Amino acid sequence: MVLLKEYRVILPVSVDEYQVGQLYSVAEASKNETGGGEGVEVLVNEPYEKDDGEKGQYTHKIYHLQSKVPTFVRMLAPEGALNIHEKAWNAYPYCRTVITNEYMKEDFLIKIETWHKPDLGTQENVHKLEPEAWKHVEAIYIDIADRSQVLSKDYKAEEDPAKFKSVKTGRGPLGPNWKQELVNQKDCPYMCAYKLVTVKFKWWGLQNKVENFIHKQEKRLFTNFHRQLFCWLDKWVDLTMDDIRRMEEETKRQLDEMRQKDPVKGMTADD
């Protein structure tokens, strides 16, 4: 049994802008989660092309997670089992990410399939699932300006879209009705990231607990990440994809150094 949910994240940026903003924010957020032997290690970051014509950027990363999983898993899992591998195929505006664990092999899987569409999250079944499968998928809307969707320990005033105003674009702050107002603002673009998340965790006695925990953490991650992405708008809105590739090279070097020298930091599990 696997647990499927679709998270819909609406943003006041265009689909083209988001391509740069997402990659910039992934690089920055990785630094905030890396230190004390934990965090992100980038193994591969290179273009790919498949036989069917799909092409884009392929990345393979290892996440060293010791303090970022619940205590009940830490107590049961042997040393080294808390590293997960993330392989991503970014054929923007479609992206596919597969997360696995060498210790659990085929008993553990997180798959995130994302379509980026120029709408307000109104499309049903953008991932073209079979009707019977789609019937069982829960659609969850993430509002980046809703303070109640953010854990108090994750909240940062400088990463609050309800307070941020972009100097370069004039966008923000986002009020309680910002999504409805977007429709009438002809000068402000918008888009939705439709994130279909499949979670499989086969471990007798823990399956439901861990699958629900993973979905809770994915929602938390998507919420915090997209709040940051919008509040960092002025840092990335003028960048090109060439700028991003140069930045990713530098970030890889920094992450290797930070993992060895910095203290543990970033998001930890809610036990």
Swiss-Prot record:
It catalyses: a 1,2-diacyl-sn-glycero-3-phosphocholine(in) = a 1,2-diacyl-sn-glycero-3-phosphocholine(out); a 1,2-diacyl-sn-glycero-3-phospho-(1D-myo-inositol)(in) = a 1,2-diacyl-sn-glycero-3-phospho-(1D-myo-inositol)(out). Its main location: cytoplasm. One of its GO terms (molecular function) is phosphatidylcholine transfer activity. Residues 251-264 have a biased composition (Basic and acidic residues). SUPFAM superfamilies: Bet v1-like. Pfam families: IP_trans (PF02121). The modification N6-acetyllysine is found at residue 216. It is found in: Cytoplasm; Nucleus. Phosphorylated by PKC in a calcium and phosphatidylserine-dependent manner. GO terms for cellular component: cytoplasm; cytosol; membrane; myelin sheath; nucleus. One of its GO terms (biological process) is axonogenesis. Keywords: Acetylation, Cytoplasm, Lipid transport, Lipid-binding, Nucleus, Transport. A 1,2-diacyl-sn-glycero-3-phospho-(1D-myo-inositol) binds at residues 59, 61, 86, 90, 97, 195. Catalyzes the transfer of phosphatidylinositol (PI) and phosphatidylcholine (PC) between membranes. Shows a preference for PI and PC containing shorter saturated or monosaturated acyl chains at the sn-1 and sn-2 positions. Preference order for PC is C16:1 > C16:0 > C18:1 > C18:0 > C20:4 and for PI is C16:1 > C16:0 > C18:1 > C18:0 > C20:4 > C20:3. Belongs to the PtdIns transfer protein family. PI transfer class I subfamily. This is Phosphatidylinositol transfer protein alpha isoform.
